[in-house]
């Protein structure tokens, strides 16, 4: 696990974007695992800037998003499909047929989850997975005490997660209580992982992920076992780390 501590959010975003750009430039048909939320927005903006400077070509790249709210249609501004289109896909030359995001409105969620897992396998797995981390240590929507053997599945969202995500909605009551998420087993099979965190609110989760014991109560702690993880965090998120 390589840990990069930067001064601020902007620097974190630029470093992460440069790594994604390098991946796509070196392997144009890369399979990218993408995350949503506040943390990666700056990274996506930087990726768009690199693309506009004609240094990236997304035409052969394939993407798989980590998760999607259950019960939100794609046109809903809070859906992750809407988020990805608005923050990245509508601004680069990616083939829309190469975009994969779980369908939160699927009639049969079990089939949707199995099919999503099959698509990842058929693509050859994820070359580069981007992750954020929740204040409770979740990655994707894999909440505390999730099985490390989990694949894509329907999740009951933790109260902390609902509370945290309520800032995106008019009220807490509007926040979906379930989501489809790629599982821990699927994430850990990615060839390379970049974990992003910014701000003091994430410092406890970051510390437990890196310095603590591997524990299902901190889902991100399983990343300690991965052979190629880069953690990019600002000074506030790193404030509780023991880097000796």
UniProtKB/Swiss-Prot annotation:
GO CC terms: cytoplasm
Key words of the record: Carbohydrate metabolism, Hydrolase
Catalytic reaction annotation: alpha-D-glucosamine 6-phosphate + H2O = beta-D-fructose 6-phosphate + NH4(+)
A biological process from GO: N-acetylglucosamine catabolic process
Keyword Hydrolase among record annotations: yes
EC identifiers of the protein: 3.5.99.6
Pathway: Amino-sugar metabolism; N-acetylneuraminate degradation; D-fructose 6-phosphate from N-acetylneuraminate: step 5/5
InterPro entries noted in UniProt: Glc/Gal-6P_isomerase, Glucosamine6P_isomerase, Glucosamine6P_isomerase_CS, NagB/RpiA_transferase-like
Active-site residues, record numbering mapped to chain: 67 (proton acceptor), 136 (for ring-opening step), 138 (proton acceptor), 143 (for ring-opening step)
GO molecular function: glucosamine-6-phosphate deaminase activity; identical protein binding
Family per similarity comment: Belongs to the glucosamine/galactosamine-6-phosphate isomerase family. NagB subfamily.
Function field: Catalyzes the reversible isomerization-deamination of glucosamine 6-phosphate (GlcN6P) to form fructose 6-phosphate (Fru6P) and ammonium ion.
Protein name: Glucosamine-6-phosphate deaminase
Organism in which the protein naturally occurs: Clostridium botulinum (strain Hall / ATCC 3502 / NCTC 13319 / Type A)
Lineage of origin: Bacteria, Bacillati, Bacillota, Clostridia, Eubacteriales
Gene: nagB
């Amino acid at each position: 696990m390589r840990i990069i501590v930067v001064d601020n959010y902007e620097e974190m975003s630029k470093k992460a974007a440069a790594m994604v750009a390098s991946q796509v430039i070196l392997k144009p048909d890369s399979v990218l695992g993408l995350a949503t939320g506040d943390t990666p927005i700056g990274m996506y903006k930087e990726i768009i800037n690199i693309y506009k400077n004609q240094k990236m070509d997304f035409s052969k790249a394939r993407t798989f998003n980590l998760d999607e709210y259950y019960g939100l249609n794609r046109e809903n501004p809070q859906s992750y499909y809407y988020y990805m289109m608005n923050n990245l896909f509508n601004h680069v030359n990616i083939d829309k047929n190469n975009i994969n995001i779980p369908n939160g409105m699927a009639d049969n969620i079990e089939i949707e989850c199995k099919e999503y897992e099959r698509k990842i396998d058929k693509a050859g797995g994820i070359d580069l997975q981007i992750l954020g981390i929740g204040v409770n240590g979740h990655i994707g929507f894999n909440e505390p005490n999730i099985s490390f053997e989990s694949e894509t599945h329907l999740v009951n969202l933790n109260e902390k997660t609902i509370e945290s995500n309520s800032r995106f909605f008019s009220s807490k009551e509007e926040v979906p209580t379930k989501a489809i998420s790629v599982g821990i087993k699927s994430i850990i099979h990615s060839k390379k992982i970049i974990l992003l965190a910014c701000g003091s609110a994430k410092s406890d989760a970051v510390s437990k992920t890196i310095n603590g014991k591997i524990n299902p109560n901190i889902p991100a702690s399983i990343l300690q076992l991965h052979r190629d993880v880069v953690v990019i965090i600002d000074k506030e998120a790193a404030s509780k780390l023991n880097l000796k």
